[in-house]
């Protein structure tokens, strides 16, 4: 495939058809098109409405707890002996991850559209918890679809969702993980078009979702620019974030895409190793195809069927990636790496011991690559890692893996 030309700006997408180059778009059943077009119109209006933006910013401040700190990880920086490492502390948000940034925007949009019933898919449960939280706050009905396998490995989050009044539907079809939960949510949406809003948790799905979720998450990168200028007097030299669908990464990256001197690294889940076949690294080990309403890189078998994704982290075992990431990969603006389960566990352990911060397994993938990147950089190199979630939800799983029953 010929490499696409480098654009004048990396921040103008998607086009009017919802495409980032050849990626993205709207591959949905005709029955869903009215929903999608209604959502696109409503989002365009809300985006241009200062009252909507003002309400969202007020909740981000007083309910979510933004801005999240930009924290110099002094001991970890000294340990690696290279770059000066900063954590963007998204794990300090209400509900414990970056997910709430996007959910707040979508729930306010659902209220504006007069939709009283909210559906969502979730993998690790963080998006489900954030959705259930905001539905409780605004008195909306909430139904969360979750793969039966993930229900088992994320019990604390399942209980949280139920405490918050959500109905959690375990999905028994397919691999019983995130992909299947998303399929079920889309089926629900088709059958309940009039009163239901589908709150997607990542930068995937049919247009306008990838752009809308990115816009709501871009608060991460906008704050990081301001905070780094205030603390160091200049912009960072590099950015690192983990990628499942890729919303935490897109939120950090997007405001910096046109600062071409800044190196940007996305870290996929390599599972047991990309060559093992047991991984979730769509860009490293996949090829372009269509899933969940958009064209992007996907894990596929020889017959073109969607392959099973594996990761130690329930939040990263999605067999695709957001279409904007697929495009950024092809135009060469972002470098995509991958971290194995074992590298991730070591980073999880090291961050806990060195900084007194127990990260979620998802951002521990990013930290695993920081361990390789940071030592190769000079001491004045400013590296920002998106610490996208806290590790509370992963403690039972990690304890079991390490043979230390809590």
UniProtKB/Swiss-Prot annotation:
Metabolic or biological pathway: Amino-acid biosynthesis; L-tryptophan biosynthesis; L-tryptophan from chorismate: step 5/5
N6-(pyridoxal phosphate)lysine sites (modified residues): 99
Matching InterPro entries: Trp_synth_b_CS, Trp_synth_beta, Trp_synth_beta/beta-like, TrpB-like_PALP, TrpB-like_PALP_sf
Enzyme Commission code(s) on record: 4.2.1.20
One of the record's GO molecular function terms: tryptophan synthase activity
Alphabetically ordered keywords of this record: Amino-acid biosynthesis, Aromatic amino acid biosynthesis, Lyase, Pyridoxal phosphate, Tryptophan biosynthesis
GO CC list: cytoplasm
Cofactor(s) the record lists: pyridoxal 5'-phosphate
Pfam families (UniProt xref): PALP
Catalyses which reaction(s): (1S,2R)-1-C-(indol-3-yl)glycerol 3-phosphate + L-serine = D-glyceraldehyde 3-phosphate + L-tryptophan + H2O
Organism domain of life: Bacteria
Family: Belongs to the TrpB family.
Role played: The beta subunit is responsible for the synthesis of L-tryptophan from indole and L-serine.
Subunit (UniProt): Tetramer of two alpha and two beta chains.
Protein name as catalogued: Tryptophan synthase beta chain
Organism: Methylobacterium sp. (strain 4-46)
Lineage of origin: Bacteria, Pseudomonadati, Pseudomonadota, Alphaproteobacteria, Hyphomicrobiales
Gene this protein is translated from: trpB
């Amino acid at each position: 495939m010929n490499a696409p030309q480098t654009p004048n700006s990396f921040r103008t997408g998607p086009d009017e058809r919802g495409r980032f180059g050849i990626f993205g778009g709207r591959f949905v059943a005709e029955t869903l098109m009215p929903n999608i077009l209604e959502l696109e119109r409503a989002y365009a209006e809300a985006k241009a409405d200062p009252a909507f933006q003002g309400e969202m910013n007020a909740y981000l401040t007083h309910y979510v707890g933004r801005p999240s700190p930009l924290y110099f990880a002094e001991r970890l920086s000294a340990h690696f002996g290279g770059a000066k490492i900063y954590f963007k502390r998204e794990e300090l948000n209400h509900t414990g991850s970056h997910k709430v940034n996007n959910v707040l925007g979508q729930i306010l949009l659902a209220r504006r559209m007069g939709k009283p019933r909210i559906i969502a898919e979730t993998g690790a449960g963080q998006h489900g918890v954030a959705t259930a939280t905001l539905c409780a706050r605004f008195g909306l009905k909430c139904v969360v679809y979750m793969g039966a396998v993930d229900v088992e490995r994320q019990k604390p989050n399942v209980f949280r969702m139920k405490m918050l009044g959500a109905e959690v539907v375990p999905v028994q079809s397919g691999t019983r993980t995130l992909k299947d939960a998303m399929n079920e949510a889309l089926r629900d949406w088709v059958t309940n078009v009039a009163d239901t809003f589908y709150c997607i948790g990542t930068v995937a799905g049919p247009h306008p979702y990838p752009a809308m979720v990115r816009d709501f998450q871009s608060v991460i990168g906008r704050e990081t620019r301001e905070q780094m200028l205030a603390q160091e007097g200049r912009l960072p030299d590099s950015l690192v974030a983990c990628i499942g669908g890729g919303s935490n990464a897109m939120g950090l990256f997007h405001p910096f895409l046109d600062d071409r001197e800044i190196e940007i690294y996305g870290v996929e889940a390599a599972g047991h190793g990309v060559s093992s076949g047991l991984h979730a690294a769509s860009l490293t080990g996949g090829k372009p195809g269509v899933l969940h309403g958009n064209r992007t890189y996907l894990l596929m078998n020889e017959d073109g069927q969607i392959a099973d994704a594996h990761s130690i982290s329930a939040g990263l075992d999605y067999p695709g990636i957001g279409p904007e990431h697929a495009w950024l990969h092809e135009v060469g603006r972002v470098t995509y790496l991958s971290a194995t389960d074992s590298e991730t566990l070591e980073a999880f352990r090291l961050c806990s011991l060195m900084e007194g911060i127990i990260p979620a397994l998802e951002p521990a993938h990013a930290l695993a690559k920081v361990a390789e990147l940071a030592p190769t950089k000079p001491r004045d190199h400013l590296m920002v890692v998106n610490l996208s979630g806290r590790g509370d939800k992963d403690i039972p799983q990690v304890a079991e893996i390490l043979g230390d029953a809590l």
